[in-house]
Amino acid sequence: MANDAFPGAPDPRGVTAVDGTAKARIERAALMLFAQEGVDAVSTREIASAAQVAEGSIYRHFKSKEVLAEALFEAIHSRLFDLVETALSDAESFEDAVTRVVGVYCQAADEDPALFEYHLIHMFRFGRIDRDGRPDPVTLIAEAIARAMENGDCPPGDPELKAAMALGLVLQPAAHRMAGRLPGLMTTNAPALAHAALAALKAD
């Protein structure tokens, strides 16, 4: 991976694109620059320079910088939805479901830290967009909690609030890692985070 100053070859990993393609380099360069400077502060010229492509190449793949920025967010948002959906369908109990969901969030954070952190930072910008049929991992989690309440596996309460409480116990450590306060892999801490999330969900 190229370093933060982009002095060498661009990172070839794609977000939605095939690794090694021009589109992949554009996505990865934009991701890194958006993380460093914010979406609004980055120009398409800077993205093109970091990706080592002509500026016009960006518009062959994305209608605008904002479309590119949103596409990066939606990619990890959809990825988390798929991971959570699988975790919930494979779970044998409520406790197992909590452990699995925490595990897949930690897995996603470790597999592509830059993309996961981008999702975390830009949730307020893109996460509030209302679009029919949009896959939403948090909705899946809240619905699972509501079912657990109906089945007596979780104390009654507001499923959305409990989902926020449980996810916060995963996402805040991820934010600490992003700030350099928590070294190491998220998956290493997954058992402790799952235990804490389950305790929060079981609280009256």
How should these model regions be labeled?
Residues 71, 85-114, 162-166:
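Hydrophobic alpha-helical connector segments
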Residues 51-62:
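Short hydrophobic/aromatic patch on the recognition helix
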Residues 14, 72-99, 141, 146:
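Amphipathic alpha-helical linker/stalk segments
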Residues 87, 103-110, 121-124, 149, ...:
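Helix-loop "lid/cap" segments that line or gate small-molecule binding pockets
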Residues 1-37, 41-50, 67-70:
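Basic, helix-initiating cap at the start of DNA-binding domains
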Residues 106-128, 176-179:
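Amphipathic alpha-helical segments used for helix-helix packing
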Residues 1-11, 107, 139-150, 175, ...:
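C-terminal peripheral helix-coil segments that are non-catalytic and often amphipathic
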Residues 78-81, 126-153, 160-165, 175, ...:
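Amphipathic alpha-helical packing segments from all-alpha helical-bundle domains
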